């Protein structure tokens, strides 16, 4: 049987087969008279149905772009980062916790240690979670003390009981429900940096830090949730453990998940979408990637809270060359945005890929995108997790497509529907590895 038996051959007479498509380099915006001054422009938008943005910037779910450091930096500037999934479920959940604890009005679920812990346990815990203070509780969760990095600075004996170095007597605490203004007064009057919050039974319910209060005052543009924590999203794959991964991420405090595949207009993707939405109906689920109006309508009607548009436009993506599949990015964004509006399916559109210059961001938004996802533009900054390489006296960071062999070896095979293939020689890469000059 011929492979093309039921496929219409390409003819210039069929507009569905041959049509004009535009990418960012093909167009410019024509200026017109405006009553709005630049400083009066609002950059607020949406990442997904219920997740707002103060700037329409999202960092890509790539293992050389977004881990906790990048997600924290992006959220502080008003955007959101999508943590990549080339790590274990536990590691990805830990990355979420790092972002949620980076700054907040009050840490709802602070890291704690038991009374049987040692100095070594405390030092390891502080290093692992990038924190400077740990409440000490008993088996019932009753607050018994607090240990800070100042208490441990000159401690050489790792086996010394934590009860011998913690502050246990005359411990300063705050009652449950205290306002940030009153908490700040307590911190200032007692010259302390950590303030445990307890209920009427003296059970630990939270932790307020002076740094978090200072950040709340200095970074009004930061993208934060209802209790003052930085927002963060994380990627899922079309895998058997997708719901398990989503559950761990939700428990860690993730604000949204992204079902991240090279071809989102498939039965398998919608099956995962429905499973995740059934298990977590309040969780926003973004789905991608797609390139057509039909795909956007299909996913929106299936329950997606946003769609991610872009097949092959990225600088290190070779899908269009290897698979012969794709669509000019600007036209794809325009058609998806128009189709959702015409069908009264009001979910955000994320333009993913092909953004080489700042002007491309403007063009994408003008075409109908609610926000843009950046990869290469962020790969060369200090917050990106890529390996630093020195070449001819200049510093670079490695940057690779999630369809590269190197990335697929670390967990992204399912994104390109090759997760059943264990022989590296049989993998068909749809991405390359490159270097990005580190920006000073």
Question: Residue spans of the language-model regions?
Answer:
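Glycine-rich beta-to-alpha transition loops that act as phosphate-gripper elements at the mouths
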Residues: 61-66, 113-117, 174-178, 235-240, ...
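Catalytic cores of alpha/beta
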Residues: 70-71, 244-245, 249, 292-305, ...
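Active-site-adjacent beta->alpha loops and helix N-cap segments on the catalytic face
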Residues: 89-95, 210-221, 243, 262-280, ...
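Bateman/CBS regulatory modules and CBS-like beta-alpha motifs in cytosolic regions of diverse proteins
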Residues: 39-53, 60-62, 91-129, 136-138, ...
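An N-cap/entry alpha-helix motif that binds or orients negatively charged groups
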Residues: 2-57, 89-91, 109
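Short beta-strand/loop segments at the ligand-binding rim of alpha/beta enzyme cores
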Residues: 54-57, 106, 226-234, 278-291, ...
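Conserved small/polar residues in nucleotide/adenosyl-binding loops
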Residues: 438-440
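Glycine-rich phosphate-binding active-site loops on the catalytic face of alpha/beta enzymes
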Residues: 82-88, 261-265, 309-323, 357, ...
């Amino acid at each position: 049987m011929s492979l093309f038996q039921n496929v219409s051959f390409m003819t210039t007479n069929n507009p569905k087969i041959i049509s004009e498509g535009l990418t960012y380099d093909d167009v410019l915006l024509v200026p017109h008279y405006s009553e709005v001054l630049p400083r009066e422009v609002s950059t607020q938008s949406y990442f997904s149905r219920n997740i707002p943005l103060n700037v329409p910037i999202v960092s890509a779910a790539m293992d050389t772009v977004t881990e906790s450091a990048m997600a924290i930096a992006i959220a502080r500037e008003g955007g959101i980062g999508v943590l990549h999934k080339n790590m274990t479920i536990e590691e990805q959940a830990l990355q979420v916790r790092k972002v949620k604890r980076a700054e907040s009005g009050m840490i709802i679920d602070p890291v704690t240690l038991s009374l049987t812990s040692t100095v070594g346990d405390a030092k390891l815990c502080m290093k692992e979670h990038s924190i400077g203070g740990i409440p000490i509780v008993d088996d019932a969760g009753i607050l018994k003390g607090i240990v800070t990095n100042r208490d441990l600075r000159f401690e050489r004996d790792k086996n010394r009981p934590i009860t011998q170095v913690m502050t246990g007597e005359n411990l300063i605490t705050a009652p449950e429900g205290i306002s940030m203004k009153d908490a700040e007064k307590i911190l200032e009057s007692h010259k302390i940096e950590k303030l445990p919050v307890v209920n009427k039974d003296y059970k630990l319910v939270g932790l307020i830090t002076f740094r978090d209060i200072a950040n709340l005052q200095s970074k009004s543009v930061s993208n934060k949730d209802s209790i003052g924590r930085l927002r963060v999203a994380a990627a899922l794959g079309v895998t058997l453990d997708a719901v398990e991964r989503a559950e761990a991420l939700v428990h860690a405090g993730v604000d949204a998940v992204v079902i991240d595949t090279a071809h989102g207009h498939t039965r398998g993707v919608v099956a995962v979408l429905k499973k995740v939405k059934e298990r977590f109906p309040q969780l926003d689920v973004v789905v991608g990637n797609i390139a057509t109006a039909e795909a956007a309508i299909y996913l929106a009607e299936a329950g997606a809270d946003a769609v991610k548009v872009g097949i092959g436009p990225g600088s290190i993506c070779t899908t269009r060359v290897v698979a012969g599949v794709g669509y000019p990015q600007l036209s794809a964004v325009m058609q998806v945005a128009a189709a959702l509006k015409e069908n009264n399916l009001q979910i955000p559109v994320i333009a993913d890929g092909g953004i080489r210059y700042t002007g491309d961001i403007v063009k994408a938004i003008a075409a109908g995108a609610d926000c843009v996802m950046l990869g290469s533009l962020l790969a060369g900054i200090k917050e990106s997790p890529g390996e630093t390489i020195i070449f001819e006296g200049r510093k670079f960071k490695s940057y690779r497509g999630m369809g590269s062999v190197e990335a697929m070896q670390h967990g992204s095979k399912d994104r390109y529907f090759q997760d059943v293939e264990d022989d590296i020689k049989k993998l068909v890469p749809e991405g390359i590895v490159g270097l990005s000059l580190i920006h000073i």
